Amino acid sequence: MTSSLNPDSLPCLGTGLSTDLYFPPLDDLLNTLAKNALQPDFVEVFRGRTVDLKHAREHIVPPAIPMTYHGDALWYTDPAFEHHPAYRRETCRANRHLDVTGSPWMIHECARKAVSGRTFGYYVPPVLEPSVARIIRQNGLLLSSRLEGRTLLIEIPPFPFFSMGQLTCGEFFRQILEQTPLGMGLDIGHALTAFCLEQPIFSPARFAEWIRNTFPLEHIVEIHVGGLLSLQGTSHPALWDDHRAPVPSVLWESFDAVLATCPLPSLKAVALEVDNKEIPSIVSEFRTFREIVRRSWSPHRERRNPLPEDDKTGQVISSRKNLSPERQPADVSAVESLDFLLLETLLDGKSPAPEWTRGDPALYRERIYTDEIWEFGGHLPDLFPRTIHLVSRFIADPRTDFVSFFHRVAWTDRDPYDYLRAKTIATRMWVEHLVQEKFIHGEAAKHVLQTVREEAEQILFDQDTVNGDPCPRADNPGGCSSCDRPFTGTSLSANPSSSLPDGGL
């Protein structure tokens, strides 16, 4: 098992791909790349089932190609992180994934998909405030201490047309990372979404200088590049992270500028993110990606282009035993209040003070939120074809009605990563609500209730089959010590989130 407490001790992996295990099919992707003389130096895979990751390591990815791991569902941005049992189970699962892939690190978005009981399909970025940075720093160190020697890379999230808080993005990540053994994942597209909110004028050179002057460069271990969309008809640049989309020229140019001009002494890997993209497009883009890396990055370039002395603010501590106490205690109640402000802004249209908000949160509400409820995790009429057919006989616009209902439901799932599960149970609750309020009545009511329960049960069964990854030690006498053992660290005052009602399913 790899032990890595310092990014400088991590292996230099080179130029690779970050992808999903299931689409595009990993074996087809690697075979096609090999036929085009484009074999990656390493393969990063997203969270899946342990058995599938093990199969990929042993039978799909050639033994000479290292694998790394892109985590999910470990929302260290959550004030309740230390106390929520789901995160202990997820940490145990992540360690199993790190074991079977042999990854020296786990990269994980600094974001959430559940905030104060509201469930989201898309990443919700943190509020850029010092109190939030302290919580993330504390929880990140806590998670890092449980990764059995592997390094945690905190990845900058995408900012969906807005950001909130008084810190700049770079200042925020400095406050999280400085004087810690944590690494950073720099996603160029995600960073562009933040840059366009902070800076009035864009050029690749200005973007690279912004990265150089504001981010903790010595913590950057991995760089990602993925698909990016630009919304039309907006008053300011509105960039949208979407790995299915092509990589636009502005993103290639920005990536090139960062590699060419920013001193990155801890950079060990650069990866093109290709999950959910068609293989012919991946072949073309990976060729371009490799050409840029070969031209603009040398793993030893920091010897020629070191950080200026006054820029060396991101020193990485070589051992967790040397960590100094936090300068200020993490204030959970303050962060919870900011979470409620974030929700009021995103979902209810509340307008915070201008100095607190960049961009336009209304764009999120109008262009993302409604679509993600109906589409993300599965198009609702595809998931519940018989149910939606029956409901549409009584409700003129099922989409609007369901989105409105979902918007009013406040919960946090017992496993706060599974949006499909939450959406499935919300659909059943929505139909029950329609029956209770007499929008559907008589024999039709009995029929639609039976139908939605049957379809929901099938979805949850299929989801457990495809995504279920129970701990193999859970059935041992005494259970699993990792899943059941509480996190230890500075005490937080958050209460565990309540379970999502199962409704008898």
What function would you assign to each model-found segment?
Residues 86-183:
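Active-site acidic/histidine proton-transfer and metal-coordination neighborhood
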Residues 5-7, 30-38, 51-69, 89-104, ...:
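Acidic (Asp/Glu)-rich catalytic clusters
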Residues 11-19, 41-45, 65-71, 104-108, ...:
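Hydrophobic faces of well-ordered beta-strands that scaffold small-molecule active sites
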Residues 20-28, 42-58, 75-89, 160-167, ...:
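Acidic-and-aromatic substrate-binding clefts and catalytic sites of carbohydrate-active enzymes
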Residues 145-234:
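Acidic/histidine-rich catalytic cores of soluble enzymes
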Residues 302-505:
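Long, compositionally biased intrinsically disordered regulatory segments in eukaryotic proteins
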Residues 80-84, 123-133, 194-266:
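Gly/Pro-rich active-site loop or hairpin
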Residues 2-47:
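Boundary/entry segment of secreted carbohydrate-active catalytic domains
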